[in-house]
Amino acid sequence: MLPIDIVYFSNYSGNTKRFVEKIDYGNISINIPIDRGSGSSLTVNSPYVLFVPTYGGGEGRAAIPRQVRSFLNVKENRALLRGVVGFGNTNFGEHFCKAADLISAKTGVPVIAKVEIFGTQQDVDKVKERLTLLYGQEL
């Protein structure tokens, strides 16, 4: 188990949630609720990595789901963010995983990985490896 939690946002498709479950992480995994505005009522109290999909084809600020923006607007949540894993569709070209890029640029944390839609086993292994390199022990 690593000294870092996972916070994720997964819409109705459930792609991000399924990916987080495949990691079989052992730490706390917190889901930002889909209900609009509910992200601002959720606070974390330990360091975490954010797993986030890209919305709207990656165009501008709308690339970051509203619930995730609300969550990150809470100062304490932003302070504990240590990295971001992005999910997207390569059909959107330069906007692939744009939400992760925008969050990284705004907060100064690294983009740990970019995952196509719901990811492959290779993506799961890559994310596990990178989390281990960044935060310690084997997953």
Where do the protein language model's features map onto the residues?
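N-terminal beta1-alpha1-beta2 submodule of the flavodoxin-like/Rossmannoid cofactor-binding fold
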Residues: 1-65
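FMN-binding flavodoxin-like domain, especially the glycine-rich phosphate-binding loop
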Residues: 44-139
